[in-house]
A protein has these predicted regions:
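Extended alpha-helical interaction scaffolds
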Residues: 2-5
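Long, hydrophobic alpha/beta structural blocks
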Residues: 11, 17, 21-325
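C-terminal, beta-strand-rich globular interaction domains
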Residues: 278, 287-382
Length: 382
């Protein structure tokens, strides 16, 4: 799925835009015991209650493609004949109304999910989207439908345990202790099935959501989809950093790493300005080309390519945002940490002065120390 397709489905989670009829699921305690099963009509709920349920489900389509939202790809054999794909198709085709299929999915999640001492709420809801035709001018034509996209979403939400708080009593004009009750929080993970690719159902893919890019709950991916869990965004960065340092060795200089980061950010900016809805992806060969342009020898570049193919797999598509990690340029020594906005990384230089290595930062105007404006003396004043 690309960003435009994702946004199109996200807009379905409005009261006037969807065909969600019921909310299904279950409430589970930390001992993996089902406290209650949920089967409720959305239409019979109060408006604010409907909006809250739809808001939780919509959160499973939030975040960044390739980081929080991860493509799950089924093999041809799985789609042809496998219990895991058959279960998802049953839920989709019955609009999640098959009680046995619902319980089977929920049990898979409950038995595999590691949520520590936290209770959780599992929600399921199905929708049928009459996909409007998109004209040559890229405008949607609501009166010209092309296809019906039937899908369901699953949200897995941690539940906050009750605490005592002082609450104002309007009758007594006083604050009294009162329990907050069990509160469903934003989902930690969830998924959409099937994917909405080329504005149509793609039963070979699902879109998996993880709020935490470091912890994608591989155990749930394995239990529900029976596929090799993809690398998390953090794992992708760690593998890249290690491959860069280990294969370049002494050639992994400050200038090389700075150049690589600047070129990757340049690719990201160009992609953003192009307004291409598809996520930006680079091959290992593309990154190797960036290393070559940064002055790395062909021998080291080839070594880097081999290591990346070994770790990521052949023909792997790398997300440059995952490789760069956080949106900052950070330099650390045992005693000092320097953090600048990525677009200003060029301001920092590595120099050898008097036999010692230094990192130089321009300090012309606006210098502060713990919030106090200070002046930097000119050399001739020393």
């Amino acid at each position: 799925m690309n960003q435009k397709e994702l946004n199109e489905i996200r807009r379905r989670f409005r009261l006037d835009k969807n065909n969600f009829s019921r909310i299904f699921g279950c409430y589970v305690n930390s001992n993996r015991e089902v406290i209650s099963w949920i089967d409720a009509s959305l239409g019979l709920m109060r408006q604010e209650e409907q909006e809250m349920y739809l808001g939780l489900l919509k959160k499973t389509l939030s975040g960044t493609l390739g980081r929080n939202l991860i493509d799950i790809e089924f093999s041809t054999a799985q789609v042809a004949d496998s219990d895991e794909h058959r279960l998802l198709q049953t839920l989709r085709q019955t609009e999640c109304k098959d009680a046995n299929a619902r319980e089977t999915l929920c049990r898979k999640i409950i038995e595999s999910l590691n949520m520590g001492e936290t209770n959780c709420l599992i929600l399921l809801a199905a929708d049928a989207y009459d996909v409007p035709y998109r004209g040559k001018d890229d405008e949607l034509q609501a009166d010209a439908s092309g296809d019906v996209y039937k899908y369901f979403v699953c949200a897995i939400c941690p539940v906050k345990t009750p605490t005592l708080e002082l609450r104002y009593d309007t009758d007594e004009n006083f604050f009294h202790p009162s329990s907050t009750g069990h509160i469903a929080l934003a989902p930690e993970l969830g998924f959409l099935f099937p994917a909405f690719d080329d504005r149509a159902a793609n039963i070979y893919n699902a879109l998996f959501y993880s709020k935490n890019v470091e912890l994608i709950h591989e155990e749930v991916i394995d239990a529900v989809f029976r596929v090799e869990p993809p690398m998390s965004a953090v794992e992708q960065k760690n593998v890249f950093d290690t491959a860069l340092a280990d294969t370049l060795e002494k050639d992994c200089s400050y200038d090389v790493v700075q150049s690589v980061h600047e070129q990757l950010r340049g690719r990201i900016q160009e992609h953003k300005e192009s307004r291409d809805p598809a996520p930006l992806e680079l091959t290992v060969g593309d990154v190797g080309g960036i290393l070559s342009e940064s002055g790395v020898s062909e021998e080291k570049v080839e070594s880097f390519r081999r290591e990346c193919e070994k770790q990521y797999g052949e023909n792997a598509a790398l997300n440059p945002k995952n490789i760069l990690g956080t949106g900052k340029f950070e330099i650390t020594t045992p005693e000092v940490k320097i953090t600048v906005a990525p677009e200003n990384s060029y301001l920092i230089e590595a120099r050898m002065i008097g036999g010692r290595r230094y990192l130089l930062i321009p300090a012309d105007d606006g210098v502060e120390v713990n919030g106090v404006s200070v002046s930097i003396p000119n050399e001739e004043h020393n």
